[in-house]
Amino acid sequence: MRYSTVLAALALLGTSAVSVLAALPDQIDVKVKNLTPEDTIYDRTRQVFYQSNLYKGRIEVYNPKTQSHFNVVIDGASSNGDGEQQMSGLSLLTHDNSKRLFAVMKNAKSFNFADQSSHGASSFHSFNLPLSENSKPVWSVNFEKVQDEFEKKAGKRPFGVVQSAQDRDGNSYVAFALGMPAIARVSADGKTVSTFAWESGNGGQRPGYSGITFDPHSNKLIAFGGPRALTAFDVSKPYAWPEPVKINGDFGTLSGTEKIVTVPVGNESVLVGARAPYAISFRSWDNWKSANIKKTKRSELQNSGFTAVADYYQGSEQGLYAVSAFFDNGAHGGRSDYPLYKLDNSILNF
C-alpha cells in the first residue's frame, strides 16, 4: 500500500472518530404546541424523551433524531387543557432497560393559590414500555384515601403530588409538595397505597418536598426541598423516619427548589436538582448522611420555568439538559418551542 493511501485511510478514520464523538447540542428544540413540560426524562434504551404535558395531562413521547412525537392519553384524567388533573411528574422503573413508566397527576387546584384546594382528584399511573399512541395504564390509583389517612395521623393534609421514584422491588414513592412534607408508598402491583413518611413543615406556601428520587447504590430514597435541601429515607421498612442530609457547601435558599433526578456516573450515583437558574448536584460517600455539592447555571433558566434536569445520551456521550415548562404560556397560550438547554456536566464529577 502506498504511503499516500495510508494517510488517506488514517484521515478517514480520524473524520469518523470526530463524527462519533461530536459534541452534544447546546439545546434540543422540542416543537410541540402548548406542551408545558413540567417534567422530562430520557429513555436511553429506546432513545426517546417522555415529557409531562402539564395542563393536558398527557405523556408526550419525543424522538430527538426524527423530531417526531406522539401523545399518550389517560382516560378520565387527561383533557384538552382545562381538566381537573394535571401531569406533574414522570419516572422510570430502572434507568436502563426499563419495563415500566410512571406518571403523577396532581389536582389542578393544588397550585392555584388564588383558588386553592387540598381536596380533589389526584392520581398515579403505571405503563408498560414501549409506549404507543394506544397505550393505557396497567394500573392506576388515586390519592384521596391516603391523604385522609395522613390527615388522621399527622393532623394536616398533604396535597400537590409532584414527582415519583421507584425502589429495587418496584414499589413507588410519591412526594407531596403542599400541606406538609409527606411521601406515599404504592406497591409494585398498584394494589396498596400507604403512608410511608411525613414530618412537620417549616411554614411557607410550599412546605412539602418538591422532588424525590431513588439511589440504587445506597438503597436510599432522597427527597429534595421542603424542610431542608436533602432528606434520606430507608426503604427497607414499611414506614420511615426522615434522615436529614448534612450539606457540605453553600446550598443557598430552599425557595424555588423543583425536581431531582439520579444520574449514574460509573458505578456510583450523583443526584441533580433544579432551582432556577441553578442545577445543583449532590454526591455522598457515607450512605447519604452527608453530601458534597456543585452548581452550574444558564441565564436562560432564570425565567423559563426551570423544573427538572434530564440526563441525555448520544452513544457513550452523557449530557445534562435543563427542562423548562414556560408556565407563563398557560394552557392555551400558543407557544410551540420548548427547548432543552445543555448544562455543564462537569457537575457530575466529584
Swiss-Prot record:
> Where does the signal sequence lie?
1-22
Q: Which Pfam families match?
A: Mala_s_1-like (PF22701)
- Per the record, the major location class is secreted
Recorded protein name is: Major allergen Mal f 1
Cystine bridges = none
CDD domains associated with the record: MALA (cd12811)
Keywords for this entry? Answer: Allergen, Cell wall, Secreted, Signal
Among its keywords, does the record have Oxidoreductase?
A: no
| Keyword Cell membrane attributed | no
GO cellular component terms, A-Z: extracellular region
Places the protein is found:
Secreted, Cell wall
SUPFAM superfamilies membership: YWTD domain
